[in-house]
């Protein structure tokens, strides 16, 4: 049996329809793209480690140029990388990067899958990565995806050796080879589905002077796209905004990648012209003939001419059991006839007035359990049969003329992302929905069936809500389902300084419907919470309220304790957040996290009455910890940097990557140096090479590829134990560097003026000792500090030693500090 004739299950989840179609996927141009896909029997799987690794040019060429069915599988969602646009970190960042990747993959014309495993932070070595990722389980996931996708060709982005650099990359290359070898063996991972043997395995990441088998030039111009495949791919890469990928313009001309044939079931070769050389995959004759007939009559100004041939192809695909091919024929027919189904939530109040059709409006965006709303399905064909479906048994009442009254069940499934883990230290997610998919399925959808040339053709659309975006433009997104009240407590951990008395804890409430109720804190026995509860009343969805409680732990509190916020309304309770993750140009996703804060009781001292200024950079939660110390903190905006009395602050902190995102900081940097000269303490946290322009009081050099120490347990040597940052108010030893998370630090100096004093030394296994991590210098009457330790990772999780060291760091600015 030819591999192309085997049934391939449709793997598009409902949410795959949430992305608004690109111009190249609509109308006559979209039809031509679909015809290319219908003509190709080949399936390709591209294995990468995390978002933005992909060979975007080759994927675009294969999919949009050759019509191959391309799936990209990413082992992780990039949870622990840097975030250039928001303060989302860990799992929230993974959600954001999933949205970015879906938009990028749409540009390439590819589908997207994920394994269960998480990005645990930058890793320099294969050995460290495999200590964190359970090798056999990652291979199991890759095997499962191979068996579900049934590719003819597997393309590994990485080779599996030191040439790949990053430890995650090396592991991805190695594990892709192991999964390729295991997928066709029914004795291996029998729980991962029926065996499927791909026919070829290639690896990427090669240069012209390396060993290679074939080249792929994505710099070929495609008149259908109006650009080269590489240029089209670059537009997709720009969706990875949180990583700053794809920012450079792709110029016309050759864009060549080199691939090496690692293994083959159809014979090896020194040189090839295509990934599909020597493959005999073919489509049923009736299907191929129908596609050829549709191609023969294709016309941009009369795309409907191909409909009879497409209907014949649809019939042939169904007869052959090729469900995926049948779905492509249905898409082609819809494109040829200009058919589009929309299924929209109607506004609560009818739109009236002469210009009502020109005014943007919003509708209910999130349905709460038991909520009733009205919706309309339209396709523009009177002969269409429309059905409304859901996963959870929504009540559906037809009101005629495509209008429906819908009621969400009391136990409606939440639209929060369906991959979750108990802790950011867990290496794997559990899936509570479609395994390995990018986003959860839509809550409700409509299907419209029409008859074309004797064949039923079905279109599908999720129920969408209308909203107004950041540019005041009306847009749509699938209706979400969530609780009536979202409850959150901010940071997952906080510090309580023993002996400091009570503290205020703010509970954030947001309504998803009109609702009245109360909110309380559940704390351990012996803890005092005032008041016992507080009432709230929301008149409509989208209202927010901060409720403050005063929490007093017992004097003998120690270790970690959980404090939980619970909202009660009617007979229901909510003790979790329901928060939107969104960025302009992307879809919307929702995350739900327990409204629990762990409180770490610590013996930690900090200077009294500290006044701290903070220059926020790309976004972090360091200010929260400063406030937990009892210090007052102001965020310094452009106006403050330009004209405020900076001498009002004992210490000023510059946030992560601030010199990359705050041009006002660069413009007013001299004022900060004058602040130091007059007695202030300025602490600059890790910054990217934009900082490599001598913004300090004395020269330094970072280079465009600065060093970092990624092993969070790498040994640390204190070089200047007598320095005041180590002597008080907390006595710091090397033990305070134990139990750090994810990494030590990033973006170290490689050279510096002798007036800077290096304070610590550290290195990963195999790395030269690094002393450019933490530099301090006297300047005039003050002190200038560059500290590239990963405070933005340690402090939100209240890592004890990091908290103690940071308390000393900000206390350097105290008027009575020992160094003054």
Positions of predicted regions on the chain:
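Catalytic beta-strand/loop cores that center a nucleophilic Ser/Cys/Thr
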Residues: 704-798, 817
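Proline/serine/threonine-rich low-complexity linkers at boundaries of modular beta-sandwich domains
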Residues: 328-346, 354-355, 476-485
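A glycine-rich, often tryptophan-bearing local segment used as a flexible ligand/cofactor-contacting loop or short
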Residues: 657-738
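N-terminal signal peptide c-region/cleavage motif recognized by signal peptidases
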Residues: 13-15
């Amino acid at each position: 049996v030819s591999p192309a004739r085997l049934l391939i299950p449709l793997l598009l989840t409902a949410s795959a329809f949430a992305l608004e179609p690109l111009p190249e996927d609509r109308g006559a141009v979209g039809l031509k793209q679909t015809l290319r896909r219908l003509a190709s029997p080949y399936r390709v799987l591209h294995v990468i480690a995390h978002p933005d690794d992909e060979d975007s040019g080759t994927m675009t060429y294969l999919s949009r140029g050759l019509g191959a069915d391309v799936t990209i599988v990413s082992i992780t969602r990039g949870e622990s990388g840097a975030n250039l646009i928001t303060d989302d970190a860990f799992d929230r960042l993974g959600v954001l990067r999933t949205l970015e990747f879906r938009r990028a993959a749409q540009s390439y014309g590819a589908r997207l899958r994920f394994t269960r495993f998480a990005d645990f932070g930058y890793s320099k070595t294969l050995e460290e990565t495999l200590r964190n990722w359970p090798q056999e389980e990652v291979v199991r996931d890759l095997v499962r995806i191979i068996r579900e996708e049934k590719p003819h060709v597997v393309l590994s982005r990485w080779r599996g050796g030191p040439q790949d650099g990053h430890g995650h990359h090396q592991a991805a290359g190695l594990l892709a080879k192991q999964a390729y070898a295991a997928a066709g063996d029914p004795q291996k991972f029998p729980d991962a589905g029926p065996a499927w043997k791909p026919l070829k395995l290639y690896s990427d990441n090669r240069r012209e002077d390396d060993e290679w088998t074939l080249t792929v030039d994505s710099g070929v111009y495609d008149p259908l796209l109006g650009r080269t495949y590489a240029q089209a791919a670059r537009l997709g890469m720009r969706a990875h905004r949180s990583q700053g990928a794809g920012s450079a313009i792709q110029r016309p001309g050759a864009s060549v990648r080199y691939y090496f044939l690692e293994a083959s079931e159809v014979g090896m070769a020194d040189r090839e012209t295509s990934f599909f050389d020597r493959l005999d995959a073919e489509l049923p004759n009736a299907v191929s003939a129908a596609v050829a007939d549709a191609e023969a009559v294709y016309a941009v100004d009369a795309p409907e001419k191909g409909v009879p041939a497409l209907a014949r192809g649809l019939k042939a695909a169904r007869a052959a059991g090729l469900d995926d091919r049948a779905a492509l024929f249905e898409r082609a027919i819809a494109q040829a006839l200009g058919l589009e189904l929309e299924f929209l939530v109607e506004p609560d109040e009818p739109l009236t007035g002469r210009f009502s059709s020109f005014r943007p409006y919003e509708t209910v965006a999130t349905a709460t359990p038991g909520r009733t709303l009205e919706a309309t399905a339209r396709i523009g064909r009177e002969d269409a049969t429309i059905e409304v479906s859901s996963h959870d048994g929504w009540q559906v009442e037809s009101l005629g003329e495509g209008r429906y009254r819908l009621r969400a069940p009391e136990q409606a499934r939440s639209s929060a992302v369906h991959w979750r883990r108990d802790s950011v230290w867990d290496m794997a997610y559990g899936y509570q929905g479609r395994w390995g998919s990018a986003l959860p399925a839509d809550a409700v959808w409509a299907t419209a069936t029409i008859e074309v040339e004797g064949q039923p053709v079905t279109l599908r659309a999720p129920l969408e809500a209308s909203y107004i975006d950041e540019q005041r433009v009306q847009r749509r997104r699938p209706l979400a389902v969530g609780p009536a009240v979202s409850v959150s407590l901010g940071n997952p951990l906080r510090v309580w300084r023993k002996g400091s008395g009570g503290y205020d804890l703010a509970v954030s409430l947001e309504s998803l419907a009109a609702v009245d109720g109360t909110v309380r804190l559940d704390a351990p026995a012996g803890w005092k919470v005032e008041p016992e509860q507080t009432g709230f009343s929301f008149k409509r969805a989208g209202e927010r309220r901060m409720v403050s409680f005063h929490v007093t732990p017992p004097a003998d509190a120690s270790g970690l304790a959980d404090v939980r916020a619970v909202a009660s309304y009617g007979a229901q309770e909510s003790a979790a957040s329901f928060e939107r993750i969104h960025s302009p140009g992307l879809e919307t996703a929702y995350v739900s996290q327990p409204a629990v804060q762990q409180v770490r009781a610590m013996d930690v001292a900090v200077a009294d009455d500290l006044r701290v200024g903070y220059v926020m950079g790309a976004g972090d939660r360091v200010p929260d910890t400063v406030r937990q110390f009892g210090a007052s903190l102001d965020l310094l905006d452009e106006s403050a940097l330009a004209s405020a009395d900076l001498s009002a602050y004992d210490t000023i902190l510059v946030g992560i990557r601030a010199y990359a995102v705050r041009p006002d900081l660069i413009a007013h940097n001299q004022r900060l140096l004058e602040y130091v000269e007059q007695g202030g303490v300025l602490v600059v946290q890790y910054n990217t090479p934009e900082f490599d322009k001598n913004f300090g009081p004395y020269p330094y050099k970072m280079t465009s590829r600065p060093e970092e120490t990624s092993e969070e347990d790498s040994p640390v040597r204190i070089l200047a134990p007598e320095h005041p940052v180590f002597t008080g108010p907390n006595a710091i030893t090397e033990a305070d560097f134990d139990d750090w998370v994810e990494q030590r630090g990033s973006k170290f100096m490689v050279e510096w003026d002798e007036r800077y004093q290096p304070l610590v030394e550290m290195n990963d296994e195999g790395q030269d000792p690094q002393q450019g991590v933490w530099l301090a210098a006297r300047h005039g009457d003050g002190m200038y500090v560059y500290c590239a330790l990963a405070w933005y990772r340690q402090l939100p999780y209240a890592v004890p030693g990091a908290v103690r060291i940071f308390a000393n760091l900000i206390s350097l600015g105290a008027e009575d500090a020992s160094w003054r």
